[in-house]
Amino acid sequence: MKVKIEESWKEVLNNEFNKGYFKKLVKFIKHEYKTKKGKIFPPPKLIFNAFDSLPFKDIKVVIIGQDPYHGKNQANGLAFSVDSEIKIPPSLQNIFKEIEKSLKIKTLPNGDLKRWAIQGVFLINTILTVEEGKPSSHKDIGWEIFTDEVIKIISKNLENIVFMLWGNLARSKKKLINPTKHLILETSHPSPYSANNGFLGSNHFSDALNYLKQHNKNKINFQ
């Protein structure tokens, strides 16, 4: 099982990678990929795609998702993202809808959010793998411990980051973030079931850009 991760992250996460729970997690995941060939998403090399897409110090915005898409060919290791040839999922359609309304721009006609990641948007799911057709199938195997630590490390070691917490699971991570150092934006999940409960009309993207500008950080193009 080969995974890719950007060099600066290896240093930042070295302690975590050497902890007992993480070694158990890796053992379990390797077994899953080996015994359920083609049924575990994303492909192994993309598990850490969020970490491989931008250096640690370049993070400006953190968007927290739940677990990867569980349909074939959907998950690509970036929360809410799909490859450019894949139909845009409903939650991401609502994200684009909110961006267009809030920022008065036209989003691109594909769901590959690598274009955001390389500008400093860290798109992290709380669980990094899933079995086909079984949402939350890799819950409580260790991923949440790992991603909680990642959020804490970002909060502790970086300054003036925008954290977008959408839905109850993401909002439960608020306690891991220092509110005196960072901007925390909370609302409902962009899923069709809850987008009208606050997400649509939240203006999170315009709030984020204003905050970045106030702290002399380069603008992100959310198209």
From Swiss-Prot:
NCBIfam families: PRK05254.1-1, PRK05254.1-2, PRK05254.1-4, PRK05254.1-5, ung
InterPro entries to which the protein is assigned, alphabetical: UDG_fam1, Ura-DNA_Glyclase_AS, Uracil-DNA_glycosylase-like, Uracil-DNA_glycosylase-like_sf
PANTHER family, A to Z: URACIL-DNA GLYCOSYLASE
Gene: ung
Organism expressing this protein natively: Borrelia garinii subsp. bavariensis (strain ATCC BAA-2496 / DSM 23469 / PBi)
GO MF entry, a single one: uracil DNA N-glycosylase activity
Annotated Gene Ontology cellular component terms: cytoplasm
Gene3D superfamilies with a match to the protein in the record: Uracil-DNA glycosylase-like domain (3.40.470.10)
EC number assigned by the record: 3.2.2.27
UniProt family annotation: Belongs to the uracil-DNA glycosylase (UDG) superfamily. UNG family.
Cell compartments where the protein resides: Cytoplasm
Primary localisation category: cytoplasm
Pfam families according to UniProt: UDG (PF03167)
The entry's keywords: Cytoplasm, DNA damage, DNA repair, Hydrolase
Protein name according to UniProt: Uracil-DNA glycosylase
Organism superkingdom: Bacteria
General function of this protein: Excises uracil residues from the DNA which can arise as a result of misincorporation of dUMP residues by DNA polymerase or due to deamination of cytosine.
Coiled-coil boundaries: none
Gene Ontology BP, a term: base-excision repair, AP site formation via deaminated base removal
Active site residues per record: D67
Substrates-to-products reaction catalysed: Hydrolyzes single-stranded DNA or mismatched double-stranded DNA and polynucleotides, releasing free uracil
